[in-house]
Amino acid sequence: MKKITFILFLLTSFAYAQQQTVTFTVAPAVFSEDESITVTINGNSINESTWSVNDNSLYLWGWSFDSNDQNTQDCPTNGTWNSSDEANKFTYNSGTDTYTKTFVPTSFFNRTGIGSFGFLVKAKNGDGDKKSQDIIVQVGSFQVDLTTPADLSSTILSSGSDFSISATNTGGNASYVLKSNGTTIDTNASTANYSYTHTNITENQNYTLEVTQGENVITKTFSVIINPGTIIEAMPSGYEDGITYNLADNTKAILVLDAPNKDFVYVAGSFNNWQPTSAYAMKKDPDTGKFWLELNGLAEGESYSYQYWVVEETPVTNSPALVKTADPYSTLVLSQFDDPGIPASKYPDMPVFPSGQEREVTVLKTGGPGYDWQVTDFEKPKKEDLIIYEVLVRDFDAEMSYQNLIDRIDYFSNLGINAIQLMPVMEFEGNESWGYNTAFHMAADKFYGPSDKLKELIDLCHQNGIAVILDVALNHAFDRNPMVRMWMDDPNNDGWGGPSSENPYFNTVARHSYNVGNDFNHQQDRTQYYVKRVIKHWIQEYHIDGFRWDLTKGFTQNCTANDEACTNTYQQDRVDILKEYADYSWSLDPSHYVIFEHLGTDIEEQEWANYKVDEGKGIMLWGKMTDPYNQLTMGYTENANINRVGHVSRGFTEKRLVGYAESHDEERLMF
């Protein structure tokens, strides 16, 4: 009896705009980090019932900054967003209809050197935007206000422009030192109102303004990015989007970025100390419109990190002019958010996220030995003979690593299975996840171990006659994805947002009813190119034997987010595009498994199951039979017909049905 499991990830997100604007006071108004303060919220500024709060249970969600308004840390007693810690509960005062919270900042935030802190008011479960606006409170009697430009801002200028800087401070006169790219360009020993104009700027500038009063020092940082103009130059043939290594010269690599509507792009990285000059402005190919740049002087075997600084001087409303992003075709990504949670025991010698940078960066390394495959001619089990064991690496064993699976290969062999299906291992947001919140489809997530460990696992499976199938979520991508971020709608200007109206890859609103994340538009040529590159990468680089395509109902452009009937009926556009993706997979590997999690109508699934079946191909379809099997386990005869676990019942010419009684998306029927 075949036991095949999978995950059906149909998550509909319902977000209700329930944010409220509260009024508040902080007493005393001026305080140091080691003084007790009281935050008071006016009860009449909150409609508790909007948040389904009926017992005056409101909570403070806090975070703190250092003296330079950087290095954000969450309050250690926040709890989780959907379950605030009781330590952060406000005290309700019925006589005055106020909510109060008293604390000492250094104790509350468990740090010193606090320059400011932020907080918001929320319901215990903040899901659905049950929160107030963000509130920022300054700490200390000495404060610096950077009037022009904004703190942490990047200003885009034409070459030769002047740039004005002004700031004020509290607490009396202070000493000001302005540095650009590490060199002091102006000082003022005693003032409370500072101003300076930097003239004739021709290169990118990273500024620091150091303000000292007594023993207190506050540093403000900001930058200028120079528009280098459009550098038109034909790109040599043979280069793909992403990194193309020069196999004849390991000191060189070519970077290619497809960024329509963008005016210019810089490459910033460890090879230029994250201070790109005009030499690192990407050229634009006149035929394709793609940006490209050849890197020289690289050391063979050394890991470099880089990202693109992508600029659109007149973006659409709510889109940022500057986006810093990793390469969409990254095969190894470093993350300021996730990497601190990956232990060295799981990923030895992991490249380090570059200090002082923001957002994900891509790792580039020329030369070096590739993985030495022991099996290069694996003969896959026949489609009709597959016995698939689904694995979520995170939950398989305590260490949550590929090594866990490698160490248990005998366990898999003894079970009698002949295929392992890995739930998504592509770079996803966070460290502990099912993996369907994918951000970088060509990068292996580091939380489970190095990419060579994944290859070792696949190689070992092949040595034991076990195929490896990869679960892929290519109907959507999440917000860290570079193709979302380069054309994002960011009304809050916080660096996060969904696709804007000019996004060439994603729909602004999902075109099917089961969407999660950002919905790919698979009728766009660029999306199709991206998907095919992903397919090629995992087949050729990782020797993956097949893909289980998640939520294939989402590959249509014909429906709306609220029209479930449309989503569930036959759609010609997704039939055609999914056949095209299957054909491409088979062009790389004629025996490749193509498996769809569609759960649709027989007439649509027949199109795929019978497609090229006379050539030994045909697409396999998941067949959920949980309910009738469950009826049988309870001894009931009603609705207990399991006839549809067979392919004939669905009109399939050959055995192309992956029938199952249970999956991890369903309750288990047996233990």
Which residues fall in each region the model found?
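Active-site-proximal helices and loops of the catalytic beta/alpha 8
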Residues: 163, 233, 426-427, 434-437, ...
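Substrate-binding/active-site clefts of carbohydrate-active enzymes
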Residues: 325-330, 368-543, 551-570, 580-589
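Conserved structural position at the C-terminal beta-strand
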Residues: 121-123, 211-213, 310
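Basic K/R-rich, polyanion-interacting modules in nucleoproteins and related proteins
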Residues: 224-265, 317-385
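Solvent-exposed segments in extracellular or luminal domains encompassing
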Residues: 190-206
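Short, solvent-exposed loop/linker segments at the N-terminal edge
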Residues: 29-35, 152-161, 246-247
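Aromatic-rich carbohydrate-binding modules that target alpha-glucans
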Residues: 57-110, 247-249, 254-303, 311-340
